[in-house]
């Protein structure tokens, strides 16, 4: 078995994987340090059945397209396929209240490729907790939101890194005896070491090291 960190294990997924993120955030908030659902939602019975009644703080980073025609940004109380589900504003407000967050910083990423699929970030925090709730919205559809202005995979990694507890100590202790299994790029494809690229080094003890090798 992999020797996963007891304080720095994270979960991310898109669409149905995003719904799984929220389910685990409700049912296993003490197992995972933070969650990053992409184009996900919560079904109403997930709240009315009180599976999110735990007071355990939960760090959440949702990315969602305002033009998503599969999992509508505003939710759908009349969906006949999966069943009614909540809108993103309702979900984010739930987690903000859950974590007792009081501060909000809003920022707009430069639209570098002029495609008007502008990404806006909403970051909620508080001085009394290390947990945060982030929301990135973009004018695209049911996808990761990689529109050329933002690399969502890197933003998720930055979020997880910021939410990490004692990360540097954990990495230092484990890399001394771990064996490298493979190297992958940000899309999960196997890769050889190359310069000026973000790569992830995966070790046999379950740890992952992020590297950028400059010329």
Segment roles from a protein language model:
Residues 198-215:
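C-terminal tail/sorting-segment detector
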């Amino acid at each position: 078995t992999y020797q996963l960190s007891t304080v720095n294990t994270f979960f991310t997924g898109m669409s149905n994987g995003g719904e799984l993120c929220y389910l685990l955030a409700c049912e296993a908030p003490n197992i995972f340090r933070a969650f990053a659902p992409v184009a996900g939602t919560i079904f109403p019975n997930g709240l009315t059945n009180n599976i999110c009644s735990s007071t355990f703080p939960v760090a959440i980073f949702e990315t969602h397209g305002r033009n998503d025609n599969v999992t509508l940004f505003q939710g759908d109380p009349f969906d006949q396929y999966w069943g009614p589900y909540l809108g993103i504003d309702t979900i984010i407000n739930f987690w903000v209240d859950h974590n007792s967050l009081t501060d909000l910083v809003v920022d707009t990423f430069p639209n570098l490729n002029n495609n008007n699929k502008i990404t806006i970030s909403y970051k909620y925090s508080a001085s009394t907790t290390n947990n945060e709730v982030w929301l990135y919205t973009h004018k695209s559809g049911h996808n990761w939101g990689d529109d050329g202005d933002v690399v969502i995979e890197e933003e998720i990694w930055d979020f997880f890194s910021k939410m990490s507890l004692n990360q540097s100590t954990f990495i230092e202790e484990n890399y001394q005896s771990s064996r490298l299994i493979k190297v992958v790029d940000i899309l999960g494809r196997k890769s050889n070491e190359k310069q000026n690229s973000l790569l992830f080094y995966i070790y046999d003890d379950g740890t992952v090291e992020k590297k950028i090798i400059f010329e």
